[in-house]
Amino acid sequence: MDPIDMYRRATDGAIAVMRAVAPEQLELPTPCAEWSVQNLIDHMTGSTAYLRASLAGQPPSPLSGTSATDFSDGADAAASALMEPGALERVCMSPLGFEWTIGHAVMGTIMDTVIHTWDLATATGQSVELDPGLVEMCIAMFLPEMPERGRESGLVGAVVAVPEDATADVRLLGAMGRRV
C-alpha cells in the first residue's frame, strides 16, 4: 500500500470528524488525558507541521487555536511535499528523539491520526468507523512494540483488555489504552 495514499485516507477521515466539531465542543475533555478537543486538534495539526518541517530539515513550530481548515491545509501541503522524489527516504528526528526516515514518520503519523480521529469523534459524540485497511496496517506495523515504547515515555495509556473476538479496530484501540 502506498504510504502517501494511506496518509491521505487517514487525514481525510480526520478532516470529516473535525469539520463536525461545534465551537462549543472545543473545551470538552477527550480520551487523551489532560487534552481538550482544541488541544487534540492542535496536536493533530501539529503532526502535519512536523512532517513539513522534517522534510525541510527544520524543527516544527508549536501551534494553538487551529481548526479543521488548518489541519486540512497542512495535510494537503504535507502530502504534496511527500511526493517529491526521495522524500520518504530522507532521515529526520522523531518526536521521541531518535532518527528515522520520513517514510517511518509518515507511518507513525498515520497511526497517530487514526487513533486521534477516534478520540475526537468520541469526545464530540460522533460515530466514526475507522478505515479497516488503515487499522490493519497499524496493527501489523506497530503492535505490540510501539504502544510499549509509548507507555515508557508516558504518551500511551495502559493496555485496555478487549474480548478475544474483538474487531481489529477495538484491538488496536485497546492496545493504545482506549476504552471502547
Positions of PLM-derived features:
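Structured surface interface patches that mediate subunit assembly and partner/cofactor docking
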Residues: 1-13, 20-33, 46-67, 73-180
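Extended, alpha-helix-rich binding/interface surfaces that flank or overlap catalytic cores
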Residues: 40
